[in-house]
């Protein structure tokens, strides 16, 4: 019988015998996009196929390291990585490569998010006061002997633990708001109704926050690495981060991105530049449409400034869309801002 891994430990993932559930299954590809604030590139930095076995009440997280080989049409063989397929060949080809590596025939839905969007989603999952620390912890790889494989496994375990921790709250009003907020922050073809259906079916077939034996993390392609398993409880995040920082400071040196003002300064500079171009709506749209899709303001730690810069960005973008007669795009932004404000008022988001 499959025994869940609990607490901080080390495992040889080749020795684990995973359950083989039967019945209906829905597969959702979760992709973390590596694009800096305002950048339009879309390399897949985190790749996790989450399979919901509805009739068995089980969940399988298949984690694929970004360094996994795939034909990304790079002339440099070092660039032939699955993370780069999303960048060079687009989402459909990337999903095909994920199917090949994971040996899964069908992917039903995709959920993609960049750094800022991930911050917001992690806040929703119970890390409201330390989302940036949690994200830093699960993105770190330089301090681990297994490098990228360990990082990918860490992310898979984070997803597993987050599902367990939050699942029992998804059927109350706050939990439903949380699901809506997470979907609103993502680029996805997964609707709220479809997400609710998955959760309801799992619940009806025995899955809950106290069934750790019903959810597990696999690595594909198969590997015999010894991998560490961490407890990602919010209270333990600071301990893990401190351990990483003490090891990594001699490897990478100073990191300005840890400065809370770093992202705020980028946003201020961008908006100051765009404000001079308000009579050129095409230029405003070109400059701000992508930062809006990234939900770039969420990286700003000071909540008042976060909201202030969000409002300015959205105001400029809505006006530009209206000037070009693109009222549907303008309305989408207004609708999102209203949603985010409702999430914040409910306590779902910071």
State where each predicted segment sits.
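Non-catalytic, solvent-exposed segments at the cell envelope interface
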Residues: 1-350
């Amino acid at each position: 019988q499959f025994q869940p891994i609990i607490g901080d430990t080390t495992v040889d993932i080749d020795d684990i015998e995973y359950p083989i559930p039967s019945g209906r299954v829905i597969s959702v590809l979760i992709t973390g996009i590596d694009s800096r604030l305002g950048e339009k590139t879309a390399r897949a930095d985190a790749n996790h196929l989450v399979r919901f076995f509805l009739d068995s009440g089980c969940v399988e997280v298949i984690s694929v390291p970004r360094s996994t080989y795939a034909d990304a049409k790079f002339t440099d063989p070092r660039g032939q990585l699955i993370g780069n397929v999303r960048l060079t060949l687009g989402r459909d080809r990337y999903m095909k490569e994920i199917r090949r590596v994971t040996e899964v025939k069908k992917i039903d839905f995709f959920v993609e998010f960049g750094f800022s969007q991930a911050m917001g989603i992690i806040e929703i999952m119970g890390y409201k006061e330390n989302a940036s620390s949690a994200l830093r912890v699960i993105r770190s790889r330089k301090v681990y002997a297994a490098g990228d494989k360990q990082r990918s496994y860490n992310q898979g375990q984070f997803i597993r633990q987050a599902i367990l921790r939050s699942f029992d709250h998804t059927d109350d009003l706050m939990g439903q708001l949380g699901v809506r907020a997470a979907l609103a922050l993502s680029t996805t073809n997964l609707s709220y109704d479809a997400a609710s259906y998955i959760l309801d079916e799992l619940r009806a077939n025995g899955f809950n926050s106290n069934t750790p034996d019903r959810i597990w993390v696999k690595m594909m392609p198969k590997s015999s690495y010894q991998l560490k398993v961490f407890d990602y409880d919010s209270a333990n995040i600071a301990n893990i981060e401190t351990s990483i920082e003490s090891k990594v400071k001699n490897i990478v040196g100073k990191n300005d991105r840890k400065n809370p003002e770093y992202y705020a300064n980028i946003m201020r500079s961008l908006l100051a530049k765009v404000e001079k171009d308000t009579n050129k709506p095409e230029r405003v749209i070109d400059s701000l449409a992508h930062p809006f899709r990234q939900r770039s303001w969420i990286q700003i730690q000071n909540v008042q400034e976060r909201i202030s810069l969000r409002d300015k960005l959205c105001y400029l973008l809505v006006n530009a869309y209206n000037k070009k007669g693109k009222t549907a795009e303008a309305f989408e932004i207004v609708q999102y801002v209203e949603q985010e404000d409702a999430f914040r008022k409910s306590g779902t988001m910071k």
